[in-house]
Amino acid sequence: MAMGITKAEALKAVDRERGPVCEASDRIWDQPETAFQEFHSTDVLCELLEKEGFRVERNLAGIATAFSGTYGSGKPVVGILGEFDALSGLSQESESLEKTALVDGAPGHGCGHNLLGTGSVAAAIAVKEYLEKNGKEGTVIFFGCPGEEGGSGKSFMARDGVFDNLDFAVTWHPGDKNVVSVGSSLANYQIIYRFYGQASHAAACPELGRSALDAVELMNTGVQYLREHIIQEARIHYAITNTGGYSPNVVQPYSEVLYLIRAPKNSQVKEIYERVNDIARGAALMTGTKMELQFVKACSNLVDNTVMEEIMQKNLEEIEREPYTAEEIEFARKIGETFGGNHVDIQDVLVRYEKSRKAAVEQFLAPHADDVINDFIVPLMDTEECLKGSTDVGDVSWVCPTAQINAVTEAAGTPGHSWQMVSQGKSSIAHKGMQFAGKVMAGTVIDMLEKPELIEEAKKELRRRVGAEGYIPPIPEGIRPMAINPKK
């Protein structure tokens, strides 16, 4: 009988497939696509998965750009999550030190999702290698999850049961630190409010008009007063997406506004949402207009899993990282100058640790404060405080134990959703971070496959955290994914 392979040998598959994986990442960067419009990116990833021996299934949950690649059979079943959508208006030349759009107004990968999807494929390839060469029972599934940016694709997929058979899941995100992501996130709802009025000549017969634009402005004013009377941690954002027209001498008959409501728990978001709805109805009543709302999407808060986070931290610390060249360090320094210089905000990191550990962590981080690339591992954080953002990974974390890391793919201090981040998306720094993330995720999965008791411990922790009620999808039945910025 042939001998099996070790975890370290399985992880070599990430290095072996570096060429195809990096090429796929660059192809996705070259043709950026926004939420639920990622048809080229889907084709690139499905092609890669099929070449690597995965069974590809498309149109998951009825979403054209949601798909999976499966290898193996039986239990345990592990999910590896990948994203690939871009952000509107962030077109940028690769590895440029100046803000220079490739195509004015076109999208760009300002959150590194070209790397995120392919890095997760790399992890799936290594896990497949481990299962195959060891003749082990088990299933690894790569999930292509569209529309994370403003679309909450995973939330729709979770609502429709796509992740129900998973025993656990892992994912990652590009960033400027090597760190296990610890803590919760903000749940959110996104809604469009539309107002319908009556047009008239604004000077000759204004009394005949019913201004939909006035309704939007009154709604926004009402919400402004509401902010004082909601919990401190909540946030209400808005964008007027249609003012009705460009003619001030016309009473505007139509106007719409997009709202994003955030809070630490789904129940808190829902309560604020109902109050915002009342304000919208009141604005319509005051202006003699009609109001209709369209529920666009929602996502749940993240559920921490310390069992998995500790395993992921172990792999983060043990797996070797590629050193950076002098050329890479110089490029990171130069691009850092475009946003005020590279640095680690040590105080921002320290708030995530218990008081008894702060001094030791500060002593560890201090020598790295001015590093141009953060070539170190952040110690495992203690806090379970809520992060100041939202992610649809939250919905997966309610369904099965889930853990994620951030890996260095950019110069220290690079702002997210910036031209500088887009510029670095095809760099060798980015490729090295993507490969490292793939190994850390695969190593975490293999550790859990080798010790099934860890899977049970992680599941037990999840049950304790979510309670008897379990996962209640925040997106109502019948709501379908919506592309906010469709292709023109």
Predicted segments with their positions:
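Acidic/His- and Gly-rich active-site-bordering loop/insert found
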Residues: 4-109, 114, 118-139
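Divalent metal-coordination and catalytic microenvironments
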Residues: 28, 69, 80, 113, ...
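Histidine-centered active-site/metal-ligand motif
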Residues: 29-31, 109, 113-116, 173, ...
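Conserved short loop/turn motifs at secondary-structure junctions
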Residues: 33-34, 143-147, 296-301
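Histidine/acidic-residue-rich, glycine-tolerant segments that coordinate divalent metal ions
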Residues: 65, 87-89, 95-108, 114-115, ...
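Metal-dependent amide/peptide-bond hydrolase catalytic core
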Residues: 217-488
